[in-house]
């Protein structure tokens, strides 16, 4: 009854929003049809600025460090996996580590039944990376270095979906979110591998400006996400 004529602005970094926020919006609108909800995507610098100038209520993100200006609530985790061109010779000796498309897409590999691939097997292969400012780029490089080699990066790209399609063309190995596979069709052109490095597991946060008044709409949206508004991460 308190949420009949209010507005709520929820935004996210690109791709995370298209995959996650759409479903949440449907649930929220069904429960609170009177709330006007704006959902946008953008780059992390613009979105952080919007959060701090109060034009954005809640931000779904993976890369803003905790600090004096924001409060973060853990929403979920995502897994980074390898997408390797099927034509690469290295795949022949790694058959026991390969995942089926559905297995990779649905996260069924998270248990112990699927073994992580030995990353050092790819030391001589070309890689497709996201650009340096992207958190996945930093994680990708760290995963390779932790395996004892410096990756041979052929190309730096802006979007993770583009890196998927470039890998599909055979140009190099891409680090992708496993949830991306829910947005594409199965293909024989790629083979998927689990990564054992802790850097491959990434937190997704719902973030708000610290000290800002928590509206009933914001509180309701957080609770819909199974988040306790009074319990931000310290």
Predicted regions and their residues:
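N-terminal winged-helix
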Residues: 3-32, 36-49, 213-216
């Amino acid at each position: 009854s308190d949420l009949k004529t209010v507005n709520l602005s929820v935004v996210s970094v690109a791709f995370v929003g298209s995959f996650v926020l759409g479903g949440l919006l449907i649930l929220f609108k069904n429960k609170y049809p009177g709330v006007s909800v704006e959902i946008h995507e953008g780059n992390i610098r613009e979105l952080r600025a919007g959060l701090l100038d109060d034009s954005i209520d809640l931000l779904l993100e993976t890369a803003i460090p905790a600090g004096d200006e924001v409060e973060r609530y853990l929403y979920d985790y995502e897994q980074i996996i390898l997408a390797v061109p099927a034509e690469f010779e290295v795949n022949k000796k790694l058959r026991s580590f390969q995942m089926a498309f559905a297995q990779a897409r649905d996260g069924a590999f998270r248990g112990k039944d699927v073994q992580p691939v030995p990353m050092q097997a790819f030391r001589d292969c070309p890689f497709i990376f996201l650009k340096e400012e992207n958190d996945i780029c930093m994680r990708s490089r760290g995963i390779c270095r932790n395996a004892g080699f410096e990756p041979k990066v052929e190309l730096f790209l802006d979007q993770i979906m583009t890196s998927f399609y470039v890998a599909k063309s055979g140009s190099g190995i891409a680090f992708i979110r496993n949830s991306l596979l829910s947005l594409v069709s199965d293909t024989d052109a790629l083979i998927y591998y689990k990564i054992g490095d802790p850097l491959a597991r990434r937190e997704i946060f719902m973030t708000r400006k610290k000290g800002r008044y928590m509206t009933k709409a914001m509180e309701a949206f957080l609770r819909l996400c199974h988040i306790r508004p009074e319990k931000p991460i310290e």
